[in-house]
């Protein structure tokens, strides 16, 4: 058994503030990936009044052995009121930046793209000053569905590659590394004004050389932002941690990624794909992109 090192211990949150966020989420019947995936940063994020909203859940149609989200082959139908409830939460929490993600919905023809579009539109209507980041699944390679999401105009589109290609069969058996790269390439080709983002976990048995090769693959498809964090085993039934990577290695990857041309690399043991995501607003000011008037993608 690999013993968890001191650098992975987090401070206890101030539960009064955390409780108020949880109360709001329960009031609006919303799920968060913070809770469903047992994120170690939940206390810090809830204390700061931020959350990553999990749509179309809480059950997922894939059973990835690293993930703590419940598996359900046939989840409940989509709730048409969810986009408006999520937009209401954005207003109540006064969010400058919102991260919206979802479970995999392989049971739906469009993978849930229409729900992403409806939610982006609802947030735009209720809180036009809020920048929107969507963290999407691979949509089973349905690129028309991806185009629908891109046309809705989120500022950031995130799709996590999760791990190095050698480990996909064990870590992400229903995923496909090349399909994930193609998704990110299509974001760059179809909507170059959108900031693209991806994230990976380490500590699953990959080598540093494999991580560097993955980073190079992401740059080749035009990925702008990269997050790297330590994998933590949610329960004994999930994949075991193979190694706890020291903070110095994360810092080395951060420096290397910046030298490769990523606009931002967030790399530390406790980094998760949505951790401090609001910092992208400063990045957008530093590297502005001209967004054309809304129109269907041709």
Curated annotation (Swiss-Prot):
Residues annotated to bind [4Fe-4S] cluster 1? 34, 39, 45, 274
- List the subcellular locations: Cytoplasm
EC number of this enzyme: 2.8.1.8
Protein's UniProt keywords contain DNA-binding: no
Q: Which Pfam families match?
A: LIAS_N, Radical_SAM
Instruction: Provide this UniProt record's keywords sorted from A to Z.
Output: 4Fe-4S, Cytoplasm, Iron, Iron-sulfur, Metal-binding, S-adenosyl-L-methionine, Transferase
- Which positions in this protein are listed as binding [4Fe-4S] cluster 2? 60, 64, 67
Q: What positions does the domain Radical SAM core occupy?
A: 46-263
Extract the GO molecular function terms from the UniProt entry.
4 iron, 4 sulfur cluster binding; lipoate synthase activity; metal ion binding
The cofactor binding remark recorded in the entry reads:
Binds 2 [4Fe-4S] clusters per subunit. One cluster is coordinated with 3 cysteines and an exchangeable S-adenosyl-L-methionine.
Hey, which pathway is this one from?
Protein modification; protein lipoylation via endogenous pathway; protein N(6)-(lipoyl)lysine from octanoyl-[acyl-carrier-protein]: step 2/2
Q: Which cofactor does it need?
A: [4Fe-4S] cluster
Write down the InterPro entries for this protein, in alphabetical order.
Answer: Aldolase_TIM (IPR013785), Elp3/MiaA/NifB-like_rSAM (IPR006638), LIAS_N (IPR031691), Lipoyl_synth (IPR003698), rSAM (IPR007197)
Gene3D superfamilies per UniProt: Aldolase class I (3.20.20.70)
- What domain of life does the native source organism fall in? Bacteria
The reaction(s) catalysed by this protein are:
[[Fe-S] cluster scaffold protein carrying a second [4Fe-4S](2+) cluster] + N(6)-octanoyl-L-lysyl-[protein] + 2 oxidized [2Fe-2S]-[ferredoxin] + 2 S-adenosyl-L-methionine + 4 H(+) = [[Fe-S] cluster scaffold protein] + N(6)-[(R)-dihydrolipoyl]-L-lysyl-[protein] + 4 Fe(3+) + 2 hydrogen sulfide + 2 5'-deoxyadenosine + 2 L-methionine + 2 reduced [2Fe-2S]-[ferredoxin]
Q: What's the family?
A: Belongs to the radical SAM superfamily. Lipoyl synthase family.
Q: NCBIfam families, alphabetically?
A: lipA, PRK05481.1, PRK12928.1
UniProt name for this protein = Lipoyl synthase 1
Which organism is this entry from? Answer: Thermosynechococcus vestitus (strain NIES-2133 / IAM M-273 / BP-1)
Q: What phylogenetic lineage does the species belong to?
A: Bacteria, Bacillati, Cyanobacteriota, Cyanophyceae, Acaryochloridales
Q: Which gene encodes it?
A: lipA1
């Amino acid at each position: 058994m690999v013993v968890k090192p001191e650098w992975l211990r987090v401070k206890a949150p101030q539960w009064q503030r955390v409780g108020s966020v949880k109360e709001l989420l329960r009031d609006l019947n919303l799920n968060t990936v913070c809770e469903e995936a047992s994120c170690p940063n939940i206390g810090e994020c809830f204390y700061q009044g931020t959350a990553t909203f999990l749509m179309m859940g809480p059950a997922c149609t894939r059973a990835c052995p690293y993930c703590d989200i419940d598996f359900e082959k046939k989840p409940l139908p989509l709730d048409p009121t969810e986009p408006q409830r999520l937009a209401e939460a954005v207003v109540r929490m006064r969010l400058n930046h919102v991260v919206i993600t979802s479970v995999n919905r392989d049971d739906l023809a469009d993978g849930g793209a229409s729900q992403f579009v409806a939610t982006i539109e609802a947030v735009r209507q209720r809180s036009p000053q809020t920048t929107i980041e969507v963290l999407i699944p691979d949509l089973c390679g349905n690129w028309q569905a991806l185009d629908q999401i891109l046309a809705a105009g989120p500022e950031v589109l995130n799709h996590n590659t999760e791990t190095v290609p050698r480990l996909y069969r064990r870590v992400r058996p229903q995923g496909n590394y090349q399909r994930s790269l193609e998704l990110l390439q299509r974001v760059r080709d179809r909507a170059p004004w959108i900031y693209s983002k991806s994230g990976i976990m380490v500590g699953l048995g990959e080598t540093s050389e494999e991580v560097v090769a993955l980073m190079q693959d992401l740059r080749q498809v035009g990925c702008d932002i990269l997050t790297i964090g330590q994998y933590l085993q949610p329960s004994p039934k999930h994949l075991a941690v193979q190694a706890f990577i020291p903070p110095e290695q994360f810092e080395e990857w951060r420096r290397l990624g910046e030298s490769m041309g990523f606009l931002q690399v967030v790399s530390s043991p406790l980094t998760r794909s949505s951790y401090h995501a609001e910092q992208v607003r400063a990045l957008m000011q530093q590297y502005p992109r001209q967004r054309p008037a809304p129109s269907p993608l041709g």
